[in-house]
């Protein structure tokens, strides 16, 4: 690609392709074992300031993923004073089932919000490669990041692993 404009068009197109891939994949993946308790813990962090439901993982992804839920009047199960892992797991399942049912609309929104981190990572790959190796290498690196199966498979999950 010659010129700055062509490079930026390619970057925007590749990032759009990555976002489209994530949106496509999000609808086809079932919930992981502990994804609902991460979602519930993130929601509780925003509304109560309680970081104790899922303290073994850093809160950034949980908080970012649950931003789309802010302002909604969601049912929250009463905490029963169980061990924090049991509390988050059991209440997370109930919370998601009561508020989202089988539609998985909330899951879709939370996963896409978490996927913003992957889009940011891809842009950082582009900028770092451009700084170190030039524009052509940066576009190649961005293309590799956008179509990397590992990044695609895990980027839109609401996980902290």
Where are these regions (language model features)?
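Membrane-helix interface segments
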Residues: 5-6, 133-139
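Short helix- or helix-capping micro-motifs
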Residues: 14, 141-146, 153
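Interfacial juxtamembrane loops and adjacent helix segments
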Residues: 52-113
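N-terminal membrane topogenic signal
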Residues: 1-10
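Helix-to-loop transition at the C-terminal end of transmembrane segments
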Residues: 20-37, 51, 73-80
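Transmembrane-helix motifs of polytopic, lipid-linked glycan transferases
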Residues: 112-132
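Short acidic/glycine- and proline-prone juxtamembrane loop motifs at membrane-interface regions
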Residues: 33, 156-161
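Hydrophobic membrane-insertion alpha-helices, especially the h-region
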Residues: 11-22
